[in-house]
C-alpha cells in the first residue's frame, strides 16, 4: 500500500508493482519520435512499443511497464486550447502503462489492474465503476468475477470510445475503463449518460484488449498473438490520491503555480497561472530534447507553447520574463514539483532551458505590446456571439506577427466568433501575392511573370546529374536581363537558359549549385566541331519544383534557341561539393552517436570550399569532443565505406532508421535515402561514391549562433590540406618572430609573457608613484574620508586599478584626467557606504553640474564629459556628500 501520495511516489509504486509481477521496465522514450512520421510527438504510452505490437520489431519482449512522457498539442489529440480552462487537460502529461505482447490477456490484465487500485492504492471500491465495450461479454464476466461488482457497476458502452484501433487497418480491440466517483458534491453523471462530461466520474485507467485485426474492407479477424495496452494518467490518479478533483490542485502543479504567483506578485487570474505552469513544463521537456523555437514543424509547436504562456504572463501585468524563473522548481530536490530524479535530462539542459525561455518570452513581449492594444480596441465594439472580422485577424498576423491561435484564444474566452472565411480569403490573397515574390526571392530577381508563362509551354527539366557530369541538351528558352524573352544571346550577354535535360545540380538541401560550361555542338541540324559558341554557367536554380534555370554569361560566339549544347559541370567543384555533403551526413551521425543522441540538425550549407552544420546543443563543444569528432570522421574516411542511395516511400525509409529533417514536407511520396555506413538520411544532394574520396576532415570553428544552437564549420580534401599548410606557415612565422625553434615556441612565448607581466607590474608601480606625487586631497566629511585629485599623463585603466587597490570600506575616491578632449572621472566607493551611496550614483551627481554620461556598479564607476574644465564639480560632490552623510 502507498505511504505517500506525491506524484513521484505514485510513479515509483506503479513501476515497482508491475516489475514484481514479471514486467520488464522501460524508461520513457523521447517526446520527439525519430522513426514515426505519422506523429509529431509521443502522445501515448504504447508509442514506443508500436513496432512490437505490429511485429515489425523482432525483439523477444513479452511484457513491459513504463511511465511515458507525452505531449498532445496537435492533430487528432490537441489539448492546447483547453489548458487552463478545464480541470484535467494538459499539454504535457505522464502516462503509466503496462503491456503484454502475447504473454497474458484479459483475465490477468483485469486482475493486475484490480489488485493495484484496491491493494496498492487502497481506493474505496464503492467509488469505482467499470465500463466495457457492449459486445465484449467476456470482459464483463471477468470484471464481475474478479471485482464481485453487481451488474449496475459494470457499464456497457456502445460508442467507439470503448473500441480502440491503431488506424483504419491493423490491430484493434475493445477497451475497458476504470472510473472513480468523486461524490455528489461534484457535478456529472455516469459514463454513457447525458451528464457524463461532468467531473464527478473520472476515468483513471484504460485497458485495451488488442485481439482483432481490421482489414481495409473493415472485416475483423482474430489476431494470432493477443496483446494488452493500458494507460493511466499520472496526474489524474495523483488527484484522486490527494483528494482533489482538479489536476491543478495536485502537489506538482501547486508548487509551479505558487512560484508563478510569487514571482509575478499577482495571485489573481487563476487560469493564467495554470496555463503558465503547464506550458513551462511542456516547453522545458521539449527544449531538453534539443528543440529550439522556430517557424516550422516541431520548432513552431515549441514557439507556440512559449508564446501562449507569454500572453498569460502579460495578462498578469508582469513586465519581466517569468517562465524561466518558474522552471527551476522542476529541478529543485526540495520542491513537490521535482521531476529531475526520473527525467535527468531536465538537469542536464537547465542552462539551455532557462536561456531559451527567457529569450523567447522577451522577444515576443514586443509583439504583445504592439498588437494586443489593437486587438483590445477592436473587441470593445463586440459582445459575446459577435464575429471578429477576418480582416482584423489577418492584419494582426501579417503586419504585427501576432499568432492567429492566440487571437482565437482571446476571442474564444469572450464568446466571440472567428470570421474563418474572411481570414482565409485574406490568406489566399496574400499567398497569391507572395507566390511571385517568393519566386523572385528564390531566383534572385528572376521575372516571375515571364517564367510562369514559359512554364505553361514546357515540361520539367530532366535532371541526370547524379550519374553524368556532361550531357547533350537542347536550349528551349532564354530570358535576357530578367525582363524579356530572346532567341539569340551574344558575347557578354547575361541570360537565363532553360534546357530539356541537365547535369547541373540546382541549389537545394543546403548544397550550393553547380557551375560549368555550355558549348554549342549542333545548330540548325549541323554538327559544329570545335565550336566557339560557349557560355559560362554561373548558377543553377530550380523553380516551380522542376524547371531548371541556368544563369549564364556568353563567353564567345552566340547561343540560339534550338541549339544542341554540350552541358558540362565543373567536375572539380562538384567533387568538392560531394565530399563536403557526405562529410556533413557523417558529422551529423557522429554528433548523435558520440556527443548526444538528442542532437538535431538546424541547418547546413554545403559549399565547395567548406561545410557548415548547425545543430541543437546547449553548450560549447570541448577541445576533447572536437578531437573525438575529427578522429571518428577520419576513421570512417579510412574505412572507405560505400555511399549508397535508394528510392523508397517515406514510411519504409523511416522504418529502416532514416533521418528526415522535416518529415511533414515529404507526405507519402517516394524519397531518396543516402546510406553511408550506419548513417541514413533523406537527401536529394550529390555525394561521393566512397568515403575515402572525402580525403581528410578538419573542424575550423565551433560557435554559438543562437540560444541552444551551435555551428560547426569544417573543410575536407584539398581545402583541409591547404588549411593545415596555412596553420603550419603561421606557426613558422611565430617561431621566427619570437626567435625560437618550432618545437620550443610555447616555451619561448611563456617566457616572453612572464617578462611582459613583470614589466607591466613595474609600469603600474611607476604610475602609482606618479599619482601619489601629483597630489591627493584628503577631506573628512562626517565619518568618511573623501580622497580626490586631478591627474595628467596617467591612463584611465591605471586610475581604476589604483582606486581598487587603495579603496577601503569607509572611503570615497575620485580622480579625473583629460583623455581625447574629454574629462574622465573615476569614482570608487567603499563597501560599508553602499547603503547610502553607490559609485554609479555619481553619474547623476556630476550630470547636475555638467552634461555627462557613464555607468558602473556599487563599487566603481566612470563618467565622461566634454567639459574639460572641472567647473564646480568637486565642490558640488562635497555638498552632496555632506547632505548624505550628515543627514
UniProtKB/Swiss-Prot annotation:
Free-text remark on how the cofactor is bound: Binds 1 zinc ion per subunit.
From the record, give the transmembrane residue ranges: none
Cofactor(s) the protein needs:
Zn(2+)
What molecular function terms (GO) are annotated for this protein?
alanine-tRNA ligase activity; aminoacyl-tRNA deacylase activity; ATP binding; tRNA binding; zinc ion binding
- Swiss-Prot/TrEMBL catalytic activity: tRNA(Ala) + L-alanine + ATP = L-alanyl-tRNA(Ala) + AMP + diphosphate
Which cellular compartments is it found in?
Cytoplasm
For the ligand (Zn(2+)), the binding residues are 581, 585, 683, 687
Q: Which Pfam families match?
A: tRNA-synt_2c, tRNA_SAD
Instruction: Report the EC number(s), separated by commas if there are several.
Output: 6.1.1.7
The record ties this protein, via SUPFAM superfamilies, to: Class II aaRS and biotin synthetases (SSF55681), Putative anticodon-binding domain of alanyl-tRNA synthetase (AlaRS) (SSF101353), ThrRS/AlaRS common domain (SSF55186), Translation proteins (SSF50447)
Record-linked InterPro entries: aa-tRNA-synth_II/BPL/LPL (IPR045864), Ala-tRNA-lgiase_IIc (IPR002318), Ala-tRNA-ligase_IIc_anticod-bd (IPR018162), Ala-tRNA-synth_IIc_core (IPR018165), Ala-tRNA-synth_IIc_N (IPR018164), Ala-tRNA_ligase (IPR050058), Ala_tRNA_ligase_euk/bac (IPR023033), Thr/Ala-tRNA-synth_IIc_edit (IPR018163)
* Broadest EC class assigned to this enzyme: ligase
What does the record list as GO biological process?
alanyl-tRNA aminoacylation; negative regulation of DNA-templated transcription
What the protein does?
Catalyzes the attachment of alanine to tRNA(Ala) in a two-step reaction: alanine is first activated by ATP to form Ala-AMP and then transferred to the acceptor end of tRNA(Ala). Also edits incorrectly charged Ser-tRNA(Ala) and Gly-tRNA(Ala) via its editing domain.
What is the designated name of this protein? Answer: Alanine--tRNA ligase
Its taxonomic path starts at: Bacteria, Pseudomonadati, Pseudomonadota, Alphaproteobacteria, Rickettsiales
Gene symbol? alaS
